[in-house]
Amino acid sequence: MTAPLTLVLIPARMAATRLPGKPLLDIGGVPMIVHVLRRALAASIGRVAVATDTPEIAEAVIAHGGEVVMTRADHPSGSDRIHEALQTLDPERRIETVINLQGDFPTIRPEQIGAVLAPLADPAVDIATLAAEIHTEEESTNPNVVKVVGSPIRDNLLRALYFTRATAPYGDGPRYHHIGLYAYRRAALERFVSLPPSPLEQREKLEQLRALEAGMRIDVGIVDSVPRGVDTPADLETARRALGF
């Protein structure tokens, strides 16, 4: 039995308000988006491309030997952007699994990118994602940290029941910090982008709730650490230090 073909897509745009021009910010002489691209390539799990509507991002990626697919500028989410990119790159529909990797994860480890595929070994799973255990009260109560509430299936694997910015679940026991990395079965991505925004998605401002409210199954692999995203100048300096610059 051959392994399903996997495509890693990195959606990127220049519209960040807290950190303008984020994908092209310099880390050791290389744009941040290129660091993410290189880590995805190092995972060695399939073809990798950056999906963008911005010529400057495309030029930077191509200059460093990466693949780019240009998309429309009016997409409401990264999921919609990668869906368009998938259709463009694979009209023959050979790709079975699509990974959505955020372009602001320059410190993500290649093995974490590969780990997101593991929950899809169960054919009942529509979407896979990752989380890491929370170890501080500050992280637990921070609304910018998305928590996943899930039912344990086995060691290091949960079935997601809910995602929230609140402190949850209540009581003793571990809480988990959701990592915004997704692996979709192709049919699941196509269904997801066909659905309208759901009530809880709009309330929590978390698009993965659209899938749960539609009855789709999301399983969550537990990893040992959270790759820190870059949203502020302080985050950028942290990423530079982590990468030795």
Swiss-Prot record:
Superkingdom as given in the UniProt entry: Bacteria
Q: In which pathway does it act?
A: Nucleotide-sugar biosynthesis; CMP-3-deoxy-D-manno-octulosonate biosynthesis; CMP-3-deoxy-D-manno-octulosonate from 3-deoxy-D-manno-octulosonate and CTP: step 1/1; Bacterial outer membrane biogenesis; lipopolysaccharide biosynthesis
EC number(s): the record gives 2.7.7.38
Q: Which organism is it from?
A: Rhodopseudomonas palustris (strain BisB5)
The question of whether Transferase is a record keyword is answered with yes
**Which residues, if any, are the signal sequence?**
none
Give the UniProt record's GO annotations in the biological process aspect. Answer: CMP-keto-3-deoxy-D-manno-octulosonic acid biosynthetic process; lipopolysaccharide biosynthetic process
Q: What does this protein do?
A: Activates KDO (a required 8-carbon sugar) for incorporation into bacterial lipopolysaccharide in Gram-negative bacteria.
Q: What is this protein called?
A: 3-deoxy-manno-octulosonate cytidylyltransferase
Write out the similarity annotation.
Belongs to the KdsB family.
Q: Name one GO cellular component term.
A: cytosol
Reactions mediated catalytically: 3-deoxy-alpha-D-manno-oct-2-ulosonate + CTP = CMP-3-deoxy-beta-D-manno-octulosonate + diphosphate
InterPro entries, A to Z: Cytidylyl_trans, KdsB, Nucleotide-diphossugar_trans
Q: Show the Pfam families listed in the entry.
A: CTP_transf_3 (PF02348)
Instruction: Provide the protein's localization.
Output: Cytoplasm
Q: Which UniProt keywords apply?
A: Cytoplasm, Lipopolysaccharide biosynthesis, Nucleotidyltransferase, Transferase
Provide a Gene Ontology MF annotation, just one.
3-deoxy-manno-octulosonate cytidylyltransferase activity
- Alphabetized SUPFAM superfamilies for the sequence: Nucleotide-diphospho-sugar transferases (SSF53448)
Which principal EC class is assigned to this enzyme? Answer: transferase
